[in-house]
Amino acid sequence: MDENPYAAPQTDLVGAQAPHELPDWSPGLLNLLGWLCLISALGSMAVLVFIFLGDFIGIHSASLVAEWLGLAVMLLGSYLSLRLKGFAEARFAATGLGWPTWLVILAGMLTQVMLMLVSDQSLARLGWEMGLYLGLMVGYGAVTVWLAVRLLKVQNVYPVFRVMAWLLLVGGVMMATVLLMMIALLPLLGSSIAMALVFFRGARDMAGQA
């Protein structure tokens, strides 16, 4: 008998576990989501540039642009998070993503709204505004870590899916420490780019099965 029952499987586990049909998804949609992820990452970098121009150079209009662009990026990121949740559930039979995904969206929206309603001067001095903002950042980081852990528990995923989850985990931990929340933007931006690659890989898989 030539077959060795203890040998490693010779098939691609991701491909082997793929569902035969994903009626709510198409290569075109997944490619579009991938490009939107890249746009979201570019938008986040643009927000940082406008914040610098407004807070450090003193251009008031740049601060206004940063606030509204930040809101647009947050809304786009929320949509993409929900689409990633749906894709992970359909493609990899992921479970337990609902609560952490919605809490990440809620924490992000509350943080963005507070940044738009409270002045920079209020956030820069000790007071309830600073305390509330720091509390939001800790909570935002905590639920981001929770989401990342749930993503890491998903089985038979693309390698870039794992990279995305680890970057999200690192960013969430750094955000929750408050002291490292500015540096946390780097791994979080990386996770957005990795999310784009997840969608692009999904599009290639679906196109190959067609």
What would you call each of these model-derived segments?
Residues 1-28, 204-210:
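Low-complexity, intrinsically disordered extramembrane tails and loops of integral membrane proteins
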Residues 21-207:
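Hydrophobic, aromatic-enriched alpha-helical segments typical of multi-pass transmembrane helices
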